[in-house]
Every structure is written in structure tokens, then in C-alpha cells.
Design a protein with these regions (language model features):
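Periplasmic/extracellular loop-to-transmembrane helix junction in inner-membrane transport proteins
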Residues: 9-51
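Short cytoplasmic-facing helical segments at TM-TM junctions of multi-pass membrane proteins
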Residues: 118-157, 189
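Glycine-rich helix-loop "coupling/hinge" segments at transmembrane-helix boundaries
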Residues: 95, 171-208, 231-232
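Transmembrane alpha-helices
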Residues: 105, 109, 141-174, 215, ...
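C-terminal transmembrane helix and the adjacent membrane-cytosol boundary/short C-terminal tail
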Residues: 68, 159, 202-232
Length: 232
């Protein structure tokens, strides 16, 4: 295993620990009473932001598709948000909101532009002949949404859902770390770093990656089952 090989080459537990040591720390963390409370704290805020950004971005993209002025109005601030460094955004938000919900706002604003621009791109690529057919046969707004719009943006929905999930977790945990949000995964990472406990740093990192991947696969499964053929 490459990780184990590098650990043996470095041979310094203050810099790098092996996989067995990292997983030993995971089991030690799981024995602590606060472990699942910490997971719940971070997961709830990050996932709430992710799903809210998904549905709001879909609504905004649909409105922008129908009203060009709205697209021109919100594109500049969204481009700014998409390119603003997480650290700068965290510091700015600390002046306006409390630390407890910092990861929610950061995860939301990092994932919203991804969803919005991908959904809008998919809508602009819709087959105009199909849309014309829907008008001729007088599809209701709901049926147009269900049978044409959603299947039409399905590829963009999958790609953006995957990309935004990873970014939501990375930016959310980074916000917790920078903002020193207590009872969060980010705070535990910072505390382990200050204590020079690399085993715990790797343990929390593995936990974060595992949670991100688990929910990514879960969301993709739901989208593939529910949206691929407009079955909503």
C-alpha cells in the first residue's frame, strides 16, 4: 500500500502516520461520548446547505431561463462568489453571523453557483423541437417540468451533484476550522493539529472523506432512480 510505504520512508509519526494507526484513532474517537454529536453537528449544517442550494439553484435557473434580465442580474455576484477564496469569505461572514452556522452559509454559497450554472447550461441545451411539441400539445407547466426539463438537465444534475457534494464538505469543514466552531469536525482537526496528534488529524480526515463519499453516492443513487426518466 502506497500510504504504508510512505510512512515507512518518512519514519516520523509527527509528520505522517500509517493507515493502521489512523484507523486505530478512528475507533478511539468512536468510543467518545461526543463523537456522534460532533458528526451530527457538522453533517446537519453541511447537508442542509447542500440540499437547499440544490433546490434554490434549480428554481433560479428555471427563472433565469425564462427571464434573461434575471440571468444578467445575478450572474456577476455568483461569479464573484464562485471565485472568492473560502478563507476570505469565512472572515467576512464572521463579522455578520455567529460561528455556529458558519459552515452552513459557506457550504451553501460554495455549492449554489455550481448547481445554478450547470442547471442553466442544461436548460439552454434543451431540444427546441421537443419544447415546441410541448406547446402544441399544451403540456401543463408541471408536465413540461417533469417530462422535458428535468430529463433534459439530468446529465448536468448528476455532474453538479457530485462536484458540489465534495466542495460543500471541504469548504464547510474549512469554515469550521478557520472560525474555530466548537463541537465540529473542523474544530477537532484544529485541536489535533495544535496537539501535534497526527493520528487524530488523519482519523478525522478519513471520517470527513468517508462521509462526503457516502452522501455523494446516496444522492447520485436517488437522482438516478428518481430523475433519469422524469419519474418524480
Amino acid at each position: 500500500m502506497v500510504w504504508e510505504l510512505f510512512t515507512r520512508l518518512v519514519d516520523n509519526s509527527f509528520l505522517l502516520v500509517g493507515p493502521m494507526e489512523a484507523f486505530r484513532h478512528i475507533f478511539l474517537l468512536m468510543e467518545k461520548a461526543a463523537f456522534f454529536r460532533i458528526l451530527s453537528f457538522s453533517s446537519f449544517r453541511i447537508l442542509s446547505a447542500y440540499f437547499l442550494s440544490f433546490f434554490l439553484a434549480l428554481a433560479f435557473a428555471l427563472f433565469s431561463y425564462q427571464h434573461r434580465f434575471f440571468e444578467n442580474l445575478i450572474q456577476p455576484p455568483l461569479f464573484l462568489l464562485r471565485n472568492l477564496p473560502v478563507a476570505s469569505f469565512v472572515i467576512i461572514l464572521l463579522f455578520f453571523i455567529g460561528r455556529a452556522n458558519l459552515s452552513f452559509f459557506i457550504s451553501f454559497w460554495m455549492s449554489f453557483p455550481i448547481f445554478y450554472f450547470n442547471f442553466l447550461e442544461g436548460l439552454k441545451k434543451l431540444d427546441q423541437d421537443v419544447l415546441e411539441m410541448a406547446r402544441v400539445f399544451r403540456f401543463s407547466p408541471w408536465n413540461r417540468f417533469r417530462y422535458i426539463l428535468i430529463p433534459g438537465i439530468y446529465p448536468q444534475m448528476l455532474s453538479s451533484a457530485k462536484l458540489a457534494m465534495g466542495l460543500s464538505w471541504k469548504s464547510g469543514i474549512a469554515a469550521e476550522l478557520i472560525g474555530q466552531v466548537r463541537n465540529s469536525i473542523g474544530y477537532q482537526l484544529m485541536d489535533a493539529k495544535v496537539s501535534l496528534d497526527m493520528g487524530e488529524v488523519f482519523a478525522w480526515s478519513i471520517i470527513m472523506i468517508a462521509l462526503s463519499k457516502f452522501f455523494e453516492l446516496l444522492v447520485l443513487y436517488v437522482l438516478k432512480k428518481g430523475f433519469s426518466k422524469g419519474s418524480i
